[in-house]
Structure formats: structure tokens, C-alpha cells
């Protein structure tokens, strides 16, 4: 897994990467879809890794305020924290990283992201890039570029952990190295990058210059 390579920082997607929330999200989105005459089976595959406002805007529904609808969905998700759980090994792995060498980069709004991270029992990042921090969400690279900038590193020296095609596309466009997290996937959706089912066996070595290298225990 990226053997013989050192990184300046690690950037984590949130949902599906360091914590599990997809069941709750899909239930809320399915209810919203049905209330607007949309087949949930058609909508749900499009929501992963993408800002809610962009998902709704793409539907081009007449008379719908995408910002207002996205806020309603966000508030419903904030109220539904039961069943949020960490990806195995995520808490220990994140805890082994220097606090100024990692960030969370999510398409969720900040309030929702902070609630989910807390509910999962994960360390709260010093740097959290959320939906409202960018003008264009994933697939665009802006979120990962901003995270690297705030950490004071080159994004090309960063390692991104992602689980969704939109996030992988964003990280690729930014020029970062990528590891797929496939905890809740039968198989990786792409073979372009290394993949891991969990963080249980991942270990990090911190060099004197705060460079990070990873290996499987």
C-alpha cells in the first residue's frame, strides 16, 4: 500500500470512509424522494459523496428551492444519530497521526459532520473542510486543495482515503495519492488505487521531518 512512499498529510473523506452513516442517510433521502415523486432506487445511487444541494439541483424540479430542501435533509440527518459507527480501526489509526498532519474533507455540512464524528467516537479534526467551505463540491478538486492549503502542505504530497467515485474523482483532479476504503463494498469500484477494507492493520511511521509512511501490520 503506497510502499516506499512518504506523505506530508492524510486527508479523510467522512461517510463510508471513517464512519458508517449510509443507512440513515439513505432512509432520509428515500423519504424525501418519495415525497417529490422520485423513485428512491433511481436517486439513492447518486447521493454518495456529493453535496445535497448539488444532488437536488441536478434534478431540476420545478418550484423547488434546492438550498431550502438541502437544509431540511441536513436537519433530519442531524436529528438521526442512532447507528452511526466508526469504520473498524479508524479511531486508533487517526489517533496515531500528528494532529497537524490530517484533515477530514466531507460533502456534509459542518454541523452534520461534527455531530457524526462525535457520535462515532472519532477524534475531532483541527481541519475540517465541509460543504459550505467550497463553491463547487466533489467531483471538483477544490475541497482537497483547500484542505492541503490549510494544513500547509502540497496536495500532491497528501494521501486521500475515499470510498465514493465522486470523492476519488476530486482527489485525482487535485493530484493526491489515493487509497480506497471498501468496508461496505463487495469489491472496489476501480482498480486504479490500492484498497483496504478497514484501518485495523494500517500503521503509520512519523519521520523526524513529520513525513508519514504507512504499512500493513
Regions found by a protein language model. Give the residues of each.
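A short helix->loop->beta-strand "cap" motif at the edges of active sites that frequently abuts
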Residues: 99-100, 176
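N-terminal helical cap/lid subdomain that shapes the substrate entry/recognition surface
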Residues: 3-98, 109-111, 122
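Hydrophobic residues in well-ordered beta-strands that form the structural core
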Residues: 20, 104-106, 180
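Residue-level marker of regulatory loop/turn positions in helix-turn-helix DNA-binding domains and
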Residues: 86, 105, 136
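N-terminal-biased segments
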Residues: 101-105, 119-120
Amino acid at each position: 500500500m503506497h510502499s516506499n512512499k512518504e506523505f506530508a498529510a492524510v486527508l479523510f473523506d467522512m461517510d463510508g470512509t471513517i464512519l458508517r452513516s449510509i443507512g440513515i442517510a439513505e432512509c432520509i433521502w428515500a423519504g424525501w424522494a418519495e415525497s417529490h415523486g422520485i423513485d428512491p432506487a433511481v436517486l439513492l445511487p447518486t447521493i454518495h459523496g456529493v453535496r445535497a444541494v448539488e444532488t437536488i439541483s441536478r434534478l431540476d424540479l420545478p418550484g423547488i428551492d434546492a438550498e431550502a430542501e438541502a437544509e431540511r435533509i441536513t436537519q433530519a440527518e442531524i436529528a438521526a444519530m442512532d447507528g452511526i459507527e466508526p469504520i473498524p480501526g479508524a479511531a486508533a489509526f487517526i489517533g496515531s497521526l500528528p494532529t497537524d498532519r490530517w484533515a477530514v474533507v466531507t460533502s456534509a455540512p459542518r454541523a452534520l459532520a461534527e455531530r457524526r464524528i462525535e457520535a462515532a467516537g472519532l477524534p475531532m479534526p483541527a481541519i475540517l473542510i465541509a460543504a459550505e467551505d467550497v463553491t463547487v463540491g466533489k467531483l471538483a478538486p477544490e475541497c482537497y486543495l483547500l484542505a492541503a492549503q490549510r494544513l500547509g502542505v502540497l496536495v500532491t504530497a497528501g494521501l486521500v482515503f475515499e470510498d465514493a467515485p465522486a470523492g476519488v474523482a476530486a482527489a485525482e483532479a487535485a493530484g493526491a495519492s489515493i487509497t480506497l476504503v471498501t468496508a461496505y463494498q463487495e469489491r472496489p469500484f476501480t482498480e486504479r488505487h490500492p484498497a483496504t477494507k478497514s484501518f485495523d492493520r494500517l500503521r503509520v511511521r512519523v519521520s523526524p521531518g513529520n513525513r508519514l509512511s504507512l504499512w500493513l501490520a
